[in-house]
């Protein structure tokens, strides 16, 4: 079974958490694209969705699913998103697709965060296999980069990428994130940082892992 098939298994399994007549929070990325496709099969059951990226908005509309603005909803029943890494405590690194800020906003609206991944995304320590994305106000890029170096990281400017919010991304290598909650707070306090890709303060409630043996649910 290849990686795409495992992603589809996890995405399909997430449908069991979708309740009738609700608005579903939807993240972004390749695994979420599989979920959007699956969500299209039950589009008449739901009111619609709030999307964390413009790309996800477009895909939802192609499926005939109404897209709501985050400002027009007070809460969401569930938020479904993928991860670049996830640890046993259900904390994640996200932002490979540069949608991390909007993902945090939509996740904060949800009563339940459901993370869908394939088994390659599971790690013991965050930062083991994937650099940490940090969204930065453009004029602060160099200043934030120096601060990240002082904290022990090796930031790399993600060239030719502008976020949906008009900002830039620094990918920080060589961070072994032993205390994700404290690291998330510390980085978010750096002037010029919009947010970083650690999802620890608001981690996942349920993790669905696509494996060669099927979808494994961790709650």
Curated annotation (Swiss-Prot):
Gene (name only): rpiA
Any one GO molecular function term: ribose-5-phosphate isomerase activity
Assembly with partners or alone: Homodimer.
Broad class of enzyme this protein falls into: isomerase
Species of the source: Haemophilus influenzae (strain PittGG)
Pathways involved: Carbohydrate degradation; pentose phosphate pathway; D-ribose 5-phosphate from D-ribulose 5-phosphate (non-oxidative stage): step 1/1
Recorded family membership: Belongs to the ribose 5-phosphate isomerase family.
Listed name of the protein: Ribose-5-phosphate isomerase A
Binding site for substrate: 28-31, 81-84, 94-97, 121
Role, per record: Catalyzes the reversible conversion of ribose-5-phosphate to ribulose 5-phosphate.
Pfam families (UniProt xref): Rib_5-P_isom_A
EC nos: 5.3.1.6
InterPro entries: NagB/RpiA_transferase-like (IPR037171), Ribose5P_isomerase_typA_subgr (IPR020672), Ribose5P_isomerase_type_A (IPR004788)
Gene Ontology process terms (BP): D-ribose metabolic process; pentose-phosphate shunt, non-oxidative branch
Stored NCBIfam families: PRK00702.1, rpiA
């Amino acid at each position: 079974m290849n990686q795409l098939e495992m992603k589809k298994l996890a995405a399909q399994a997430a449908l069991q958490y979708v309740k009738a007549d609700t608005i579903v929070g939807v993240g972004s990325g390749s695994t979420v694209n599989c979920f959007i496709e699956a969500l299209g099969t039950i589009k008449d059951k739901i009111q619609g969705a709030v999307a964390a990226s413009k790309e996800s908005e477009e895909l939802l509309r192609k499926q005939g699913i109404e897209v709501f603005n985050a400002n027009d909803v007070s809460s969401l029943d569930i938020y479904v998103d993928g991860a670049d890494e996830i640890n046993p405590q259900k904390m994640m690194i996200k932002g490979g697709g540069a949608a991390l800020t909007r993902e945090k906003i939509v996740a904060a609206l949800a009563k339940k965060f459901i993370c869908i991944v394939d088994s390659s995304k599971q790690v013991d320590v965050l930062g083991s296999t994937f650099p940490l994305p940090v969204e930065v106000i453009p004029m602060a890029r160099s200043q934030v980069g120096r601060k990240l170096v002082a904290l022990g990281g090796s930031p790399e400017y993600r060239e030719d990428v502008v976020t949906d919010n008009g900002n830039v991304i620094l990918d920080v290598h060589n961070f072994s994130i032993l205390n994700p909650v404290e690291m998330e707070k510390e980085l978010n306090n750096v002037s010029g940082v919009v947010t970083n890709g650690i999802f620890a303060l608001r981690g996942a409630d349920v993790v669905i892992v696509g494996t060669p043996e099927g979808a494994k649910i961790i709650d």
